[in-house]
Amino acid sequence: MARKNLLAGLVDTAEIPHADVAPAYPMRGASKSMVRSLDELSRQAEKFLEGETVVELDPETLDGSFVSDRMGDSSEQFEELKQAIAERGQDTPILVRPHPSAADRYQIVFGHRRARVARELGRKVKAVVKALDDRTHVIAQGQENSARANLSFIERANFASHLEKLGYDRTIIGSALAANAAAISKMIAVIDRIPEETIARIGPCPAVGRERWVELSLLVGKTANEAKVKAIVSDPSFNELSTDDRFNSLFSGLNSAAKPVRKTTPKILENWQPADKTVSAKYSNSAKAFALSMKSRNAGPFGRYIADNLDRLYAEFLEQGNRKED
């Protein structure tokens, strides 16, 4: 197998291995250190499932969380998840609680996409049912989705703002998002400056980080720019752009120093899968970047194997005459 372009941008997106599902996660006070890594967040979220009985529920008996953390859903990512569950079954249960206001119904804490897949496949969904108060609900939801869902900055900021509007203090919001007080303050400030409709039109912007959103919020927040913002986001061509390009289009339209935005051509992804289908890989290649992502049962071990053999693989790459000329 050719080894060139095999290594850069490695991401392991395997679904969490099945766990026999956890007593309610012990809440930590403000004096305790804040969770700072995604690995730790992942372990925190899994504790909500450990030691509990996994049951099968009719997806039609499930209602969504009372606070949203996503701005739409990637149809491609959803279809990948749907195909994986159709082929292998649901590896990880979702977490639900008895609905606080509707008898014989449940409210999803986390696992909305898995529940949607089960509904579309006409299957029951594996779930852990746990009695949680609203506070524990939002912490569990925020921790699990921060660890698993690759939420963008603006999605996390929206989640933080929604929680504050529901009356939760910033200590709770920080616990849910594994963010310190300064980070939470910036998130909510961005949401306060940019109208909700404008954020909805721009979308989740997975490639846009905090500082650029802060810069945009300062531009949008200027009274002199109000008419210009409305004109840009209501232009029919605005909706034809990708979500990241919509951000760039608005930013450059408000910032005279910014470079004009060009509509980017989507990268074409290529797929690879062994005969036994124990791992699935997607990779894209451009002039300056190569990205590889893997999922399924052996994605983690195989990714670790590649990472552990980078020196050898790169040496073989150079031996095959791929050394860049000076």
From Swiss-Prot:
It holds the Pfam family ParBc. The keyword Nucleotide-binding does not apply. NCBIfam families: parB_part, partition_RepB. One of its GO terms (cellular component) is chromosome. Gene3D superfamilies: 3.90.1530.30. Belongs to the ParB family. This is Putative replication protein B. GO terms for biological process: chromosome segregation; DNA replication. It comes from Sinorhizobium fredii (strain NBRC 101917 / NGR234). One of its GO terms (molecular function) is DNA binding. Keywords: DNA replication, Plasmid.
